[in-house]
Amino acid sequence: MTKILLIKTGAAGDVVRTTVLLNALQGSITWVIDSRYEPILPTRHPNLHRVVALDHAQATLEHEIFDHTISLEEDVTCALLASKIPTKKITGIYLENKRLVYTNDAAGWYDMSLVSALGAVAANEVKKQNTLTFQQLLLNMFGLSFNGEPYCIYRNNQIKAEQRIIGIETRVGARWPNKGWSGYPALINKLQQLGYTCRLLEQRNNISEYLDDIAGCAFLISGDTLAMHVAMAYHIPSIAIFNCTSPAEIYDYGTLRKIISPQLNQAFYKTHFSQAVIDSISVEEVYAAFLQHTAINSLQKA
């Protein structure tokens, strides 16, 4: 069996979407991850041999030889690890003359990244023009086609969705403030008038508790965030608002409806906050998308 070293430490949403590799690759995978996000990974999977915290990875793995190292972090520490652990082949990011570089088979993805060999301006333009999903770009690194392989993450099967509960994630990370949306309060009011209970997702003591909160929802509304990816992993119907990040990269798995800001091109991956951007999608548009979602009939009958 092919012995694979997979280095993908964060962020949480990126870890979720990278789990498609568990279902797409054949081999014995050792996954190096930030210990904060380890609870996201499934407790068991036939291709997931073990999970190693990044802090202990060098000492744990330095005497092993891998058939294939997959290095997916644009980070010096992770690239150094990928360069040091003995392997027969590497795909992705590694260090060369103290610089982050990437292998040719990973260029489809990393040409659009912060470490792009094309330079920042060209990389952003390539990303803007891209029509492939992350899953397609990821599997292309290995000469594979994406055939709808699902995410595979932790789930507490004792938790069942409550049919009138709508999860709402209003929070966004500091890096992309324009992922936010100003219409949540008004939307929540409209949904409550229909008899739904809106569950505002909050910071939890650990990430598994946060995932459990989502698992108890019958529907989810958010920006392009971890919650969106978890909803798709759990087959929870959802709506996601795209103000500044690429909607093309997100495969919808038949459960996600995307609402795209008319200011997307102007705000594309901009890191400075713009009130006009987070105001650019109307409450009526999101409300209508909710009512038109194919899953709503089953919710209304509950």
Where are these regions (language model features)?
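Catalytic machinery of carbohydrate-active enzymes
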Residues: 1-302
